[in-house]
Amino acid sequence: YPICPSRPENYQFVQSIIDEMVEIFPSEYFHIGADEVEKDNWEQCEVCQRLMQQEGYQKVDELQNRFVKIMTNYVKGKGKKVMGWDDAFLEKEPQDLIYTYWRDWLPDQPGKITQKGYPIIFMEWSRFYLSATPSDEGLSSLYNFEFEPQFPGIVKQNVLGFQACVWTEMIPNERKFGQHVFPSLQAFSELSLIHI
């Protein structure tokens, strides 16, 4: 279950974790996540429902947005540039952070984010997750990447770059890792150089 965004003690708990992370990792960037949040239990939570009524919220997405806003401001107070998954983008009240776009089944999302003036990093699920089974189609999609017409309305100057990732829960050893990552990483590198 996700953390309850309506209890003050949960904010204190998360902030204490952030404090520890900031001490350990000196990067100027701090990614707060906020993806794939299962919100069904917030619909049933009396504390969440009470907060929604007090704040005039219509949807539980607004609870996540509130949580992201508070955590974003907290992390910024630590002198960090804040990043979060595009799941955290709520169009009517976007947060001032760098969005990491992964949900490629929402092709309008990069346009919505960048038109509001927010920076974005592309990390599309189907294209830039190098843990997918290697295929000619996968390589082709990397080599043939174009912003348009796939991402309507995108403001290219707000695209900071691209990021590839590998989730290793289905990759049992180094040999298999190499098969997944190469030559996709070369294609990804070329794509990144061409489009930025």
Where are these regions (language model features)?
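Conserved small/polar residues in nucleotide/adenosyl-binding loops
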Residues: I194-I196
